């Protein structure tokens, strides 16, 4: 596994695919400190990397158009100071944000389940829920 994860350290950026985002591979890249650039799509499979980046508080790496995706990649590739700042933020956030903090992630998930159940119990129709916390969690990029 160490060799598998070490390969990410050879890259400067992880460029996500559009129709089907990286799932485990993007998570592994973030774990070892490799920034992931993604473009949100419409379906679940095209929004996974955006959720991962939101959960680690790096929304600046989420784009919504191909043009913005390309521009962000070019900016990061030609601006080593900005890329270094993002890598530093990723390193700082790795163990303090919900993505890799299992206890915090579980608390947020449980809070979400409580909201869903309460809506059901109150006879309300399903709708998108937001788990309010002091930390950034799965922002509504739609």
Regions found by a protein language model. Give the residues of each.
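Receiver (REC) domain switch-region micro-motif
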Residues: 14
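Catalytic binding pocket for nucleotide-activated donors in carbohydrate/polymer assembly enzymes
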Residues: 8, 17-102
């Amino acid at each position: 596994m160490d060799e598998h994860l070490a390969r990410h350290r050879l890259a400067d950026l992880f460029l996500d695919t559009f129709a089907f985002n990286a799932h485990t591979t993007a998570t592994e890249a973030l774990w070892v400190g490799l920034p992931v650039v993604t473009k949100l799509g419409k379906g679940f499979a095209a929004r996974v990397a955006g959720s991962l980046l939101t959960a680690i508080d790096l929304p600046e790496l989420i784009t919504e158009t191909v043009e913005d995706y390309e521009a962000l990649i070019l900016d990061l590739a030609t601006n080593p100071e900005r890329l270094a700042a993002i890598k530093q933020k990723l390193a700082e956030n790795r163990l303090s944000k919900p993505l890799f903090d299992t206890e915090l992630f579980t608390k947020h998930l449980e809070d979400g389940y409580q909201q869903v159940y309460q809506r059901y119990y109150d006879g309300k129709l399903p709708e998108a829920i937001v788990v309010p916390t002091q930390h950034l969690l799965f922002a509504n990029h739609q």
